[in-house]
Amino acid sequence: MVNAIEAFDAKHMKPAEEIPAFRPGDTVEVNVKIKEGNNSRIQAFTGVVIARQGGGVRETFVVRKISFGTGVERRFPLHSPAIDSIKVVRKGRVRRAKLYYLRNLRGKAARIVERRDNSEK
């Protein structure tokens, strides 16, 4: 039974090369495949990752952005076939794994300091 579950998970997981290394605080652009009737298109959703949960094929992440003054959050399954690509736009420096406190902050208070990597010399 356990082997069947592991085989199912391995079959449905995306290869590690397709998923960039990102963590909470990073700004990402998620390109999602949208199907409308008989045609499909790709829609970009750019925002700050405020949480990552789960593991394996069940792993999800939450992206938050401000759209026309209103906060919009969207939860994406990491290995979903509906996700075309994920691109890290900016790396952020935070000290928490879950950034739910950003929901209560407005304007400059909701900014996240950029993380500098010294390894890119």
UniProtKB/Swiss-Prot annotation:
SUPFAM superfamilies: Translation proteins SH3-like domain. One of its GO terms (biological process) is translation. Keywords: Ribonucleoprotein, Ribosomal protein. InterPro entries: Ribosomal_bL19 (IPR001857), Ribosomal_bL19_CS (IPR018257), Ribosomal_bL19_sf (IPR038657), Translation_prot_SH3-like_sf (IPR008991). Pfam families: Ribosomal_L19. The keyword Ribosomal protein applies. One of its GO terms (molecular function) is structural constituent of ribosome. One of its GO terms (cellular component) is cytosolic large ribosomal subunit. PROSITE patterns: RIBOSOMAL_L19. NCBIfam families: rplS_bact (TIGR01024). Belongs to the bacterial ribosomal protein bL19 family. This protein is located at the 30S-50S ribosomal subunit interface and may play a role in the structure and function of the aminoacyl-tRNA binding site. This is Large ribosomal subunit protein bL19. It comes from Bifidobacterium adolescentis (strain ATCC 15703 / DSM 20083 / NCTC 11814 / E194a). The gene is rplS.
